[in-house]
Amino acid sequence: MVQLARVPFFKDTDLELASFEQRCNWRRFDTDEILVDFEDVSSDVYFIVAGEVRVLVRSQAGKEVILGEMRAGQFFGELAAIDGIKRSANVTALTRGEVCIMPAPVFREIIFASPVVNERLLRLLATRVRELNARLMEHTVLDLRHRLYSELLRLSTTRAGHEGERVVTPPPYHHVLAARIGCRREQVTREFSTLTAEGLIERTRGALVIKRPEVLETRVEEALREEK
């Protein structure tokens, strides 16, 4: 069985994947292993087959901000493969896992050979630009309290069996949330205490429950309207 067929990005295409797969490398990684670092000159694309990684960017002053996590089925490194510029992010493993490492020439060859894959890449890049634009807007106009609300909503999913509630699993560490929204851990801790006292969030075993997500949504919407 052709292993590239395990990668969602290449499913249901008319490509003969075997020849491309011969030019890729498959390797396992360990927890806390750095897969890609800032300013690396490599241009390979990494397709996550198993495991989870975290993506960080760094300001000129050295401050690091978490862009997010990636899991099996997702990939990173496409920008360097496209423009050949040094890596702009650090990608570190959160768990053990496996990646398919595809050289940039192979990636570009596939993109130009398959209209289906080409469109998938365009849609993915458009989605990422929209997400970054939304986060830029939040960092520009919202205070840390409302940035925290927005991030919690973004990280959450519907809580099964509890209508109207949302849940973040596993519960996020305060220092991780701080790195996501650009503030200090102590500030996140204070806001969590306030949200808990208001009955808006609840910490359970293995999860953070957002009891009334509509309240957080309304607060964010009102804060954004005030900036217009």
Segments predicted by a language model, with ranges:
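Cyclic nucleotide-binding regulatory domains
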Residues: P8-F9, E33-R96
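Basic amphipathic alpha-helical segments that dock to polyanions
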Residues: T194-L195
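Glycine-centered, phosphate/nucleic-acid-interacting loop/turn motifs that mediate DNA/RNA or nucleotide
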Residues: G199
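Short, cationic-aromatic polyanion-contact patches
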Residues: R159, Y173, L208-E226
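Polybasic "coupling" helices that flank or enter modular domains
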Residues: F112-R185
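Cyclic nucleotide-binding regulatory module and flanking cytosolic helices
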Residues: M1-I34, F76, A80-A81
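Cyclic-nucleotide recognition modules
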Residues: L17, G68-A126, R130
